Regions:
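Rossmann-fold NAD(P)-dependent oxidoreductase module
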Residues: 17, 89, 93, 149, ...
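Rossmann-like dinucleotide/phosphate-binding beta-alpha-beta segment
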Residues: 123-159
């Protein structure tokens, strides 16, 4: 049985992936490994029992990798794990900005108490039509985990 100490908030779904043979402990002294996200481990008192550190994220700038390597502690990260989420946010921003969604929401809030909102909305709606993304060109700088997903999603949108 391997014992894992989680330092940051790790979802239950993430912990379930470990399956049998692993349990999660509260005390770092009992742990064989640490599962973490963003806590800065520079200056962290790492028990000698720790053999591995897994970071749920792309970078390892919050982990003193050179120091831990000298101690034989293996450091893992998960580059690209959030790439789909980032791609979705990029596409959302493209749609929001091309269609004036934020501006139209502000207009609705500003006119929410207006008894003539339907008439006024009919007059104002042309300002919020925006442009379709289909047929537009986009430049994607870098085709790594995120960039390639963004580029493919844009192709799927007809860009």
């Amino acid at each position: 049985m391997r014992h894992i100490k989680t330092i940051d908030d790790i979802t239950k779904d993430g912990k379930v992936e470990f399956g049998d043979g692993y349990d999660f402990v509260e005390n770092t002294e009992e742990a064989d490994a640490i599962l973490m996200r963003s806590t800065d481990l520079h200056g962290y008192e790492l028990p000698t029992s720790i053999r591995a550190i897994a970071r749920c994220g792309a970078g390892v700038n919050n982990i003193p990798t050179d120091e831990y390597a000298k101690r034989g502690v293996v450091v893992f990260n998960s580059p690209g794990a959030n790439s789909n989420a980032v791609k979705e946010l990029v596409i959302a921003m493209l749609i929001l900005s091309s269609r004036g969604v934020v501006q139209s929401m502000k207009w609705v809030r500003a006119h929410a108490d207006d008894p003539n909102i339907l008439v006024d909305a009919e007059k104002a709606k042309k300002a919020f039509v925006g442009r379709e993304l289909k047929g537009k060109r986009i430049g994607v700088v870098g085709l790594g985990n995120v960039g390639s997903k963004v580029a493919n999603a844009c192709v799927d949108l007809g860009m």
